């Protein structure tokens, strides 16, 4: 899975989670890999 795909999946999941629960998830699983809050925020801030 390419980083662009990982970033897109994280973004979709995080937006939906925030929309329904009002806060960002503690962690996100993408492609059988679990990313912590710090890790997925780093990925979302990357310029690709």
Model-inferred region functions:
Residues 2-48:
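Acidic, low-complexity, intrinsically disordered interaction modules
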């Amino acid at each position: 899975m390419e980083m662009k795909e990982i970033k897109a999946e994280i973004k979709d999941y995080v937006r939906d989670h925030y929309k329904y629960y009002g806060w960002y998830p503690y962690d996100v699983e993408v492609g059988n890999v679990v990313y912590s809050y710090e890790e997925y925020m780093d990925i979302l801030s990357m310029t690709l």
